[in-house]
């Protein structure tokens, strides 16, 4: 006769709390950029995996998980309980940072959105315009517009890495407010940001950018426009990042 082990529910829950969340490469790169010992806010938290991981690792002392939709936020609440961080993680229904205050976060992560939406969220939270606040941004699209908008608004990128998640290539930006607005960025800075040549996944990111710029160049040529600036940027990016070596 087969024997069955009976496992108490409280034992299972204890085992769950001891589990560590494993983040995908994109979110792990965001986690890597968060400073140690901070209060963190994750905007567009989805299932709450990032703030849970930051609390588990000890990088974050407290966390606010914010989302505009109730369903993913309910999932974040359940996951916080499941992994034993409910006492340090608050889940908030919020459009961007509208329901948060400066006391909620030292580091603010906005990941998994388009660059223009990220800019809107930042522009609507005046309290981010303080040098002690740190932004970790991961645009899914229009990273060039995000960089331009950040510099035009007095923010500066102090670090940027490319990250490949197995399917797509992204960038993650570390950003602080300086108050010094810049409205004209070189094309290489606009499209490659602060990604260092030779850094992991930089050549793959450059290949993606070059594909986009070459399409722009073809469109300009077809319309009879001046392609000189684009040509120079394409040549500079190709020489610096050597995407053909990827």
Regions picked out by a protein language model, each given a short descriptive name:
Residues 16-25, 98, 104, 116-246:
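Class I S-adenosyl-L-methionine
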Residues 21-37:
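Conserved alpha-helix/loop element of class I SAM-dependent methyltransferases that forms part
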Residues 48, 52:
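Glycine-rich SAM-binding Motif I of class I
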Residues 62-67:
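Conserved SAM-binding motif I beta-strand of class I
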